[in-house]
């Protein structure tokens, strides 16, 4: 018999909001009686953009900006309909991107 599993991937630029959201999901799943694996921290993506400070010349004067994307993975094993319903009604902050796979 195969076990059913819900895999949730969370992405955010701010790691504190991401960890709070992951904790809310874990608490909600555990109170409804499902087994939870995670949150597992995935590697952080770092995008670096280099631009020239001056408009025309002065190529030696540059500025670098970076944005980091933090990620977490949560697996919910053998979810009940009560678990799925509780997760659907969960309110999470706007800065968190959620991908759910069944």
UniProtKB/Swiss-Prot annotation:
Q: Name one GO cellular component term.
A: ribosome
InterPro entries per the UniProt record, alphabetical = Ribosomal_uS10 (IPR001848), Ribosomal_uS10_CS (IPR018268), Ribosomal_uS10_dom (IPR027486), Ribosomal_uS10_dom_sf (IPR036838)
Show the GO MF annotations.
structural constituent of ribosome; tRNA binding
Pfam families for the chain: Ribosomal_S10
> Which keywords does the record carry?
Ribonucleoprotein, Ribosomal protein
Entry superkingdom: Bacteria
Cross-referenced SMART domains = Ribosomal_S10 (SM01403)
Cite a single GO BP annotation. Answer: translation
Annotated coiled-coil positions are none
- Function noted in UniProt: Involved in the binding of tRNA to the ribosomes.
Relate the assembly described in the record: Part of the 30S ribosomal subunit.
Similarity field: Belongs to the universal ribosomal protein uS10 family.
Q: Which HAMAP family does UniProt cross-reference here?
A: Ribosomal_uS10 (MF_00508)
> Could you identify this protein by its name?
Small ribosomal subunit protein uS10
- State the organism of origin: Clostridium beijerinckii (strain ATCC 51743 / NCIMB 8052)
Lineage of the species this protein comes from: Bacteria, Bacillati, Bacillota, Clostridia, Eubacteriales
- UniProt gene name: rpsJ
């Amino acid at each position: 018999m195969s076990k059913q599993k819900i895999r949730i991937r969370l992405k955010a630029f701010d790691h504190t909001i991401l960890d709070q959201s992951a904790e809310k999901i874990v608490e909600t799943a555990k109170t409804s009686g499902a087994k939870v694996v995670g949150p597992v921290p995935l590697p952080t993506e770092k995008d670096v953009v280099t631009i020239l400070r001056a408009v025309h010349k002065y190529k030696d004067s540059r500025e670098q900006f970076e944005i980091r994307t933090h990620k977490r993975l949560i697996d919910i094993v053998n979810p009940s309909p009560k678990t799925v319903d509780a997760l659907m009604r969960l309110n999470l902050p706007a800065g968190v991107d959620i991908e759910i796979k069944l």
